[in-house]
Amino acid sequence: MAFMKKSLFLVLFLGMVSLSICEEEKRENEDEAKQEDDEQSEMKRGLWSTIKNVGKEAAIAAGKAALGALGEQ
């Protein structure tokens, strides 16, 4: 009977260790995925601000050109 108790305890202990390792790996994978998402969103923000600045400069240049054309008339 004592042998069965020890065997059962060993099986349960090894199962808990295995589960703990799996959960730790899952957490690490989730952290890596979140970090990749953060890096991608930073890149998108940088790209969006560049596009916005180019659009502003183009609008200003177009406005100056239009005012210059009106001033020549």
Swiss-Prot record:
Compartments, as annotated in UniProt: Secreted
Compositional bias segments (type: Acidic residues): 30-40
Record keyword Secreted present: yes
Residues annotated as signal peptide: 1-22
Residue ranges annotated as propeptide in the record: 23-43, 72-73
Positions carrying Leucine amide: 70
InterPro entries cross-referenced by the UniProt entry: Dermaseptin_dom, Frog_antimicrobial_propeptide, FSAP
Annotated GO CC locations: extracellular region
A Pfam family annotated for this UniProt entry: DD_K
Biological role stated in the UniProt entry: Has antibacterial activity against the Gram-negative bacteria E.coli ATCC 11775 (MIC=0.8 uM), and the Gram-positive bacteria S.aureus ATCC 12600 (MIC=0.4 uM) and M.luteus ATCC 49732 (MIC=0.8 uM). Does not inhibit the growth of the fungus C.albicans. Probably acts by disturbing membrane functions with its amphipathic structure.
Family: Belongs to the frog skin active peptide (FSAP) family. Dermaseptin subfamily.
Protein name: Dermaseptin-H4
Gene name of this polypeptide: dpp-H4
